[in-house]
Amino acid sequence: MNTSVESLTHKMQRAAVGKMVDVVLSHADKDRQKTVGQLVDVAKQFYGSSFSAEAYEHARQTLTDPDSKWSKLINCVLDQTDPNVARTMALNLGYEAFFRGTKTIRENRVKYQCNIPWLILFDPTSACNMHCVGCWAGEYGHKNNLSFEDMDKIVTEGKELGVYLYMLTGGEPLVRKADILKLAEKHNDVQFAIYTNSTLIDEPFCKEVVRLGNIAFMLSIEGTPETNDARRGEGHYAAVMHAMDLLKEHGIVFGTSICYTRDNIEAVTNDEFMRFLCEKGAHFGFYFHYMPVGNEAAPELMPTPEQRKYMIDRIRYLRSEECDIPFDPMDFQNDGEFVGGCIAGGRNYFHINSAGDAEPCVFIHYSNANIHDQSILEILHSPLFMAYHNGQPFNKNHLRPCPMLENPELLQKMVHETGAHSTDLQSPESVEHLCEKCKNYAANWQPTADEIWSHTKIRESRYENYKDWKPSQPIEK
């Protein structure tokens, strides 16, 4: 398509979606449902045959039913969100990332014959004002920073490939507040999401976030004051509570980032905790299985097979219509069946640390590419990233998706074959040392995972970025 025509079409589509969003925001609860249903039709224009007619109809019925859990959740979020924040997020995350971006990404995967991610994760800084037990982030050291120009390059080049969602981690990203706000203002058509320990969120910062509208937050919290502060330090829980109050008061979208361990798994998933999060204003959250990454890791924090099975059952219950808690939890390790297994290596995301090293995953600290020397596209063609591209899925049981945690022999093989180096500049960890910590875990988890998987409905979603295998092929149990 001619570039000028494409640009005009883009502007017209964005304006049309913007009008629909304005209608949704101007009505309350039940009156919104008709327009929300029309957004399903917009999605169909972009996704086409990627989903079945039944899937589109199910989505339409669910979102237009005022009594469905998901309608109630959407209304709950919209009612407490500042209009500018809600509108900007709907356009940037909804239209640009989900609709238009996904279409562009799929085209580019075919064009460039490599993984093209849906989101890019990067660390503005390695500096952090905390030192949590078992955390790998501190092992990068505290002197590395991506310059504003580095971050601008990441977003600019990512957008050219269709990437309109950027997540910021660290270290503590808000050590770089000023540059983050500057970046969000320059790239006002993308959505930013920040993983933060909450301690640097204050009133002036919240006002700027509302003005810009394109920043959301994931706050680190781990259950009760006792379970949280035992790992994150005394006073951290109180800081999170204060940040939640500020964000809710200003109508800023935020969720939670929860690392579940052997010690806190019930505390971070029980009904009381989930309802408490909703009352504080959080209605979605990411759950992360503790990973034994780094020389200072604490492998004893990894959940038992029984605990992991509990987690799978619990998260699925919390998302079901049977549960009346308006909260949408997502489990990075256990939701593989919905995304076709491992999403790292650029398949759906990758990570750039504060030294510029491009890593397949935030938990895989090995690389042979750097944003200072290479473009995003060159990174995606680098040896380690292509090893991911050619090797995914790493296991046809998507409850055993990771080449480190559940298939440690595969990560060792890829690192050795590609010559990737450790990116932990302060305390480099050999891939043998890392994977040795996962061997017993993987062996112990396999029987339980295989038993669950044998009764799991196979998702027939389109995973066109797998090189050789498609979900329509027979799946080994």
Positions of PLM-derived features:
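Flexible mid-to-C-terminal extensions adjoining Fe-S/redox cofactors in radical SAM and related proteins
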Residues: 2-12, 16, 23, 27, ...
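Secreted/processed peptides and extracellular or luminal domains of membrane proteins
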Residues: 134, 138-141, 348, 367, ...
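Radical SAM/AdoMet-radical enzyme domain recognition
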Residues: 148-168, 174-289
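Short loop/turn microsegments at loop-to-beta-strand junctions
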Residues: 120, 346-348
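Conserved alpha-helical substructure of the radical SAM core
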Residues: 36-204, 477
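Radical SAM enzyme [4Fe-4S]-AdoMet core and its adjacent flexible, acidic
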Residues: 1-61, 229-345, 353-355, 359, ...
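Short cysteine clusters
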Residues: 128, 132-135, 342, 356, ...
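Short, charged low-complexity linear segments at domain edges
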Residues: 96-117, 329-332, 336, 370-386
